[in-house]
Amino acid sequence: IRLSLVGSEMCIRDSGGSGLRAAIEVAEHGIDVLAVGKRPRQDAHTSLAAGGINAALGTMDEGDSWQQHAADTIKESYLLANPHTVEIVTQGAERGIRDLERWGMDFAREDDGRISQRFFGAHTFRRTAFAGDYTGLEIQRTLVAKAEQLEVPILDQVYITRLLVRDNVVFGAYGFDQSDGTRYLIHADAVILAAGGHNRIWRRTSSRRDENTGDSFRLAVEAGARLRDPELVQFHPSGIIEPENAAGTLISEAARGEGGILRNALGERFMSKYDPERMELSTRDRVALAAYTEIAEGRGTENGGVWLDVSHLPRETIMTRLPRVYQTMMELQMLDITTDPVSYTHLRAHETKAN
């Protein structure tokens, strides 16, 4: 058994969007940092995020502001969101977008060069910046390139099995390389956990089958941390049902943001019963509950879903704004979404965590 000893001022687990963003921030402050991910850095789970990233840039609607973004967030959380956390996230969101732009991210833009933004659920204004419907992939590419420019060392495919703790102080981590079995003993002055959640306790989720298994939660608890609100998992309204080996594959919210329509098996546009003002652009929880209700009351499709229809949109819109949805449905079901609707159901998506 090979053992590799590694030392760093700070160790960050994982190498997805949040992990690499933290590593970049730390490195730019002159601190020695090591990022450790259990997948190849280009293939972190962030790359599966599709529809966009939210910030009150005001590029499309001048009346938007971080305060309005915060108000929308708190209201649609049923007042469960921590106001301090919401303030930090919404106030800092524009900086996050501008950093990505400065580092070379290829955002969709208007003809005059402004970053384009579209509506997502529960937004008062258009505030979702995007790159087609593969935004997460572009974010990950940008962050990997920036981290490599800063010469941040990244250990790929290393699974951290425990944090090292002495007298209630974390001083490193232990793990192994999943490809060749090499053991890693990492000494660090501080460890940041920036990994995924525990969605795989459900059968159908937007996560990969081998990810979001809750190991970051376990690492934290075994090191003496307390978990807060682990039950607050978001149910995303749209994931495909078939084939079974791909059940849960995400159909981006961008499909509804661009004008997609939800119908039950009777052909009824059912969101008019649940949120007649916002319709398909209601909050994810309301859309998911509406779809569940339609299915439970016998108005679902034969395979237990509802229909998402974008076939009324111009083909050019679909091919430029929803290319990943188009490609996914062609590959998995040989379904042309420019002419046919998609049958889907609600699924478990992700948690929002804050340190």
Question: What is each residue range found by the language model?
Answer:
Residues 1-7, 12, 346, 353-355:
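Single conserved hydrophobic/aromatic residue that forms the stacking wall/gate
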Residues 13-34:
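N-terminal Rossmann-like FAD-binding beta1-loop-alpha1 element of flavoenzymes
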Residues 16-17, 40, 134, 232:
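Residue-level detector of alpha-helix initiation sites
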Residues 29-47:
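Glycine-rich FAD pyrophosphate-binding loop
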Residues 56-88:
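Glycine-rich active-site loop/strand segments that organize a redox cofactor
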Residues 198-204:
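Flavin (primarily FAD) binding-site architecture
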